Curated annotation (Swiss-Prot):
PANTHER family: AMINOMETHYLTRANSFERASE, AMINOMETHYLTRANSFERASE, MITOCHONDRIAL
Keyword set includes Transferase: yes
The name this protein goes by in its record: Aminomethyltransferase
Signal peptide positions (record): none
Organism this protein belongs to: Bacteroides thetaiotaomicron (strain ATCC 29148 / DSM 2079 / JCM 5827 / CCUG 10774 / NCTC 10582 / VPI-5482 / E50)
Disulfide bonds: none
Any matching Pfam family: GCV_T_C
Enzyme class: transferase
A Gene Ontology BP annotation from the UniProt entry: glycine decarboxylation via glycine cleavage system
Statement: the UniProt record of this protein carries the keyword DNA-binding: no
């Protein structure tokens, strides 16, 4: 299994470790619910060094990105970040990702850990424009410092005014005595905070500094278990569950990152444009349990009569709401907010209601 610069730290802290995307990663430390609530109320630290990073540079960088991504990269100015996806030729999604605009001819793509090789091959094979591509996935470490107290802890470690970095904006500078640290106002938790990218040789010093700075705010390390419950409470999609190579961005409710602007002929645009105007055969929805029960990935969604209407893609017991919540694809006639649906849980038909995420208000 691959390791991150923090793997030994996780083991020393007694984390439950498990393989994820080929990496030995911490799933939980003090427990998923405790870690989840720590992020909601204070500050937690996630090792997300397993994520992939590709540089796209040169005079053809923008033309290449406008072709392979669904969002309008031309709208980005230096210092801004964009959520987007790589559509495939069959109406599905290769991956969802972030695009960081450094300058007009320099972009950083941050992709999902499980898809690094697939995404890299996809980019290389579709680079007919001749953009300069560089896979830096093994040369970057990343910590996500999340929660309402994150800014108070991190501000101690830099002269950069963190309150002047808006959501989906980043800066590069000195942090915890280390140069060239990317400080990004992003996250996968809905609790606020920053994501820090840096060279692996700075990892030890940055980890130590962040935990010392956050001690007075009750900082804790957080594993991938709580990362999943936090993102699900916000209704954020997880690739491999809610998105895959068969789900279209229109079906997944990602029409807002699919821009049909003039001159942007991205991969599979005609099919997605048709879906946008004519509708799809299924839609991704959020739902809350009415009956007691925890929906799980793969459970069948049925109507009152017990007929199949879809499938659960993500589900958990919400640590903040203490009810079962989930997301799944349903036939369009069942997608309206307020519609009652049922989950087939091992032969038991349990009631739920379609809601608009986030589940955590």
């Amino acid at each position: 299994m691959k390791t991150t610069p923090f793997t030994e730290k996780h083991i020393a802290l007694g984390a439950k470790m498990h393989e994820f995307a080929g990496y030995n990663m911490p799933i939980e430390y003090s427990g998923i619910i405790d870690e989840h609530l720590t992020v909601c109320n204070a500050v937690g630290v996630f090792d997300v060094s397993h994520m992939g990073e590709f540089w796209v540079k040169g005079p053809q960088a923008l033309a290449f990105l406008q072709k392979v991504t669904s969002n309008n990269v031309a709208a980005l100015v230096p210092g801004k970040i964009q959520y987007t996806c790589f559509p495939n030729e069959e109406g599905g999604i290769v991956d969802d990702l972030l695009v960081y605009c450094y300058e007009p001819e320099k972009y950083l793509l941050v992709v999902n850990a499980a898809n690094i090789e697939k995404d890299w091959n996809w980019c290389v094979s579709h680079n007919t424009e001749g953009a300069e591509l560089e896979n830096s996935s093994d040369n970057m470490a990343q910590l996500a410092v999340q929660g309402p107290k994150a800014i108070l802890a991190l501000q101690k470690l830099t002269d950069i005014d963190l309150s002047a970095i808006p959501y989906y904006t980043f800066t590069v500078g000195r942090f915890a005595g280390k140069e060239n640290v990317i400080i990004s106002n992003t996250g996968y938790t809905g609790a606020g905070g920053f994501e820090l990218y840096f060279y692996p040789d700075a990892a030890e010093a940055i980890w130590k500094a962040v935990f010392e700075a956050g001690e007075e705010f009750g900082i804790k390390p957080v594993g991938l278990g709580a990362r999943d419950t936090l993102r699900l409470e916000m209704g954020f999609c997880l690739y491999g569950n809610d998105l895959d190579d068969k789900t279209s961005p229109i079906e997944a409710g990602l029409g807002w990152i699919t821009k049909f602007v003039e001159g942007k002929e991205f991969i599979n645009r005609p099919m997605l444009e048709k879906q946008k105007s004519e509708g799809t055969t299924r839609k991704l929805v959020g739902f809350e349990m009415i009956d007691r029960g925890i929906p799980r990935h793969g459970y069948e969604l049925v109507n009152e009569e017990g007929e199949g209407i879809g499938v659960v893609t993500s589900g958990t017991m919400s640590p903040t709401r203490k009810i079962g919540i989930g997301m799944g694809y349903v036939k369009p006639e069942y997608a309206k907010v307020g519609t009652e649906i049922c989950i087939d849980m091992r032969g038991r038909k349990l009631k739920a209601i379609v809601v608009k995420p986030p589940f955590r208000k």
